[in-house]
Amino acid sequence: MGARRLGREIALQLLYSRDYTVGEASSLLEMVFDEAEPGTAAGRAFSDELVRGVLEHRETIDATITEKSKNWAISRMAKVDLNILRLAIYELLYRGDIPKNVTINEAIEVAKKFGTEDSPAFINGILDEVASTLPDKG
C-alpha cells in the first residue's frame, strides 16, 4: 500500500474517532498511529496534513457536501462516508498537486474498504459533482 493511501486511511480513522470522542487531534493521531504499520512516516505526514486541513476548512467542506448531495442531509449520512467525502473534498479544493481523478479513485477505494456496499457509488456521485465545477489541475 502506498504512503498516501495509508495516510488517507489513517486520516479517515482519526476523523471518525473525533466524531465519537473528545480530544486533541494530535493525541488521537498518536493513538491511531500506534496501531498502524511500522515505517509509515510519509503516510503519517500526509495523514496529519489531511486531518488538519479538514478541521481547518470543515465549514467550507461541509457546505460543499450539502450543496452537492441532493436529497441527503449531512446529519443522515453514514459517518464513514461523510468523513471520506470531507477528506476527498479537502484534496479537491486545497491540494492542487493531486489530480482530481486520483483523489476520486482513492476515495472510492477507501470507501470499498471501510464503507458499506453502497458507499463507493454514493461517494463517486458526490465527488464527480464537486470535481465538475473545478478547473483541471496542471
From Swiss-Prot:
What is any Pfam family matched here?
NusB
Q: Which UniProt keywords apply?
A: RNA-binding, Transcription, Transcription antitermination, Transcription regulation
Cellular component terms per the entry's GO annotation:
cytosol
What terms describe the molecular function in GO for this protein? RNA binding
Which family does the record assign? Belongs to the NusB family.
Q: What does this protein do?
A: Involved in transcription antitermination. Required for transcription of ribosomal RNA (rRNA) genes. Binds specifically to the boxA antiterminator sequence of the ribosomal RNA (rrn) operons.
User: What is the designated name of this protein?
Assistant: Transcription antitermination protein NusB
- What is the scientific name of the source organism? Geobacter metallireducens (strain ATCC 53774 / DSM 7210 / GS-15)
CDD domains (alphabetical): Terminator_NusB
Biological processes, Gene Ontology terms: DNA-templated transcription termination; transcription antitermination
